[in-house]
């Protein structure tokens, strides 16, 4: 049995208190607690506490400490239940305490996976223009349940997905100006798949791109790659030269007709 002999406010934190006790051998430092724990357990000078009571106080102090760590972590941005659990595990907090902290955070509405999923979907679709497949995968990795994800994705309509995908295409296609139209389409297709768009949405967007095919830019790309390969393969003669040129340009996405026209032009120049 111990008796509390003195309670002092810590110099560095006005919300923490040092508790001094006497176990029969004079006053000594016992432990420190948060103000919440001080009030919860009615700690005051003269109070007698046994080992069981002390263990309970110290356990609740650990819970409060972990709770405040979680609150601080949440102050930067919203988090999912799993993210909080993982954060506390990295802090080497025990599972029993983690469960209590998460339960309290849920009760106090500091964490809510449904609200998180809705806001996350809006941000990733409107700001980063990610497709639903990527958003779903990211939410699953954050521990959000399938049904919650399905609900959050309902407001991400197909029309909005197409709008976002077309914006991404418009931004990216400028960097493919030296590619053939076919190769540009393939690269844009790959980009949209990485961004998380469905095959259906990608096909619709690339069909719209087909209507914008620029013959002049296609010719510029053909001449750019054609001249580059011409310099590379001009050391070869006859059939070998033409075969290597055709293979190289075909791999770049140019049609046989386009390649033949380019080679004919080179023959006339030569």
Swiss-Prot record:
It comes from the Bacteria. This is Regulatory protein RecX. Its main location: cytoplasm. It is found in: Cytoplasm. NCBIfam families: PRK14135.1. Belongs to the RecX family. The keyword Protease does not apply. Disulfide bonds: none annotated. GO terms for biological process: regulation of DNA repair. Keywords: Cytoplasm. The gene is recX. Modulates RecA activity. It holds the Pfam family RecX_HTH1. The keyword Cytoplasm applies. One of its GO terms (cellular component) is cytoplasm.
């Amino acid at each position: 049995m111990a008796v509390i002999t003195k309670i002092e406010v810590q110099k560095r934190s006005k919300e923490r208190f040092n508790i001094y006790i006497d176990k029969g051998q004079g006053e000594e430092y016992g432990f420190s607690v948060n103000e919440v724990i001080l009030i919860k357990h009615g700690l005051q000078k003269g109070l007698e506490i046994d080992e069981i009571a002390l263990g309970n106080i110290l356990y609740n102090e650990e819970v409060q400490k972990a709770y405040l760590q979680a609150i601080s972590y949440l102050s930067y941005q919203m988090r999912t239940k799993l993210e909080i659990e993982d954060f506390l595990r990295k802090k080497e907090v025990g599972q029993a305490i983690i469960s209590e902290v998460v339960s309290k955070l849920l009760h106090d509405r500091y964490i809510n996976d449904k609200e998180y999923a809705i806001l996350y979907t809006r941000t990733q679709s409107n700001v980063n223009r990610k497709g639903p497949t990527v958003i779903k995968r990211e939410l699953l990795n954050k521990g959000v349940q399938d049904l919650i994800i399905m609900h959050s994705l309902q407001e991400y309509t197909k029309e909005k997905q197409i709008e976002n995908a077309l914006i991404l295409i418009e931004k990216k296609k400028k960097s493919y100006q030296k590619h053939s139209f076919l190769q540009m389409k393939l690269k844009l297709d790959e980009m949209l798949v990485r961004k998380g768009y469905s095959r259906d949405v990608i096909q619709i967007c690339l069909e719209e791109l087909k209507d914008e095919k620029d013959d002049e830019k296609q010719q510029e790309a053909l001449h750019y790659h054609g001249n580059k390969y011409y310099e590379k393969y001009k050391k070869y003669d006859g059939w070998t030269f033409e075969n290597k040129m055709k293979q190289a340009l075909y791999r770049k996405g140019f049609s046989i007709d386009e390649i033949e026209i380019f080679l004919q032009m080179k023959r006339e120049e030569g």
